Regions:
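Short terminal alpha-helical segments
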Residues: 1-38
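Residue-level detector of well-ordered alpha-helical segments, enriched
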Residues: 3, 33, 51-54, 58, ...
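Functionally constrained cores in energy, signaling, and assembly domains
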Residues: 4-5, 11-12, 44, 69, ...
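Short secondary-structure junctions and interdomain/linker hinges
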Residues: 14, 18, 44, 48, ...
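Short, solvent-exposed segments of well-ordered alpha helices
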Residues: 25-35, 49, 53, 76-79, ...
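Short hydrophobic interaction/assembly module
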Residues: 45-70
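Amphipathic alpha-helical binding modules
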Residues: 61-107
Length: 107
C-alpha cells in the first residue's frame, strides 16, 4: 500500500475517499477504507501525541455514526452497514487500545 497521503489526517477531515469520508459524506461503511486506515497506523514507526488525539477523534466519530444509525429519532442511516459490522470495528478498536497502552502493534 502506498502512503501518498496521511490517512489519519484524511479521516480526521473526512476527505480523499477515507473511511470517515465514506461514512459521513456518502453514508457508506467502506470496509477497505477502514482496513487501509488500520494498516496505515500499524505501519507507522512512531505515533505522536497529536496523531493519537486524531485517532481518538476518528474513533469517536465512527462510534457516533453508529449511534446515529441505530437512533430511531435520527435520519442519518448508513446505507450498507454490514450485519457483522462489529467484526470490522473491533480490530480498529483493539489497535487504538494498544496505542493507548504503548504496546507493539502487529498485523
Amino acid at each position: 500500500m502506498m502512503h501518498k497521503s496521511n490517512l489519519i489526517e484524511d479521516n480526521k477531515r473526512g476527505e480523499n475517499q477515507s473511511f470517515l469520508y465514506f461514512l459521513h459524506e456518502e453514508k457508506k461503511f467502506d470496509v477497505k477504507a477502514l482496513d487501509d486506515l488500520c494498516h496505515y497506523i500499524i505501519e507507522l514507526d512512531t505515533i505522536s501525541l497529536e496523531q493519537l488525539r486524531d485517532i481518538h477523534y476518528i474513533e469517536n466519530q465512527i462510534l457516533r455514526h453508529l449511534v446515529y444509525h441505530f437512533d430511531d429519532n435520527d435520519l442519518s442511516k448508513i446505507s450498507n452497514l454490514p450485519f457483522e459490522y462489529w467484526e470490522y470495528i473491533e480490530p480498529f478498536e483493539r489497535l487504538v487500545a494498544s496505542l493507548y497502552e504503548g504496546e507493539v502493534k502487529e498485523e
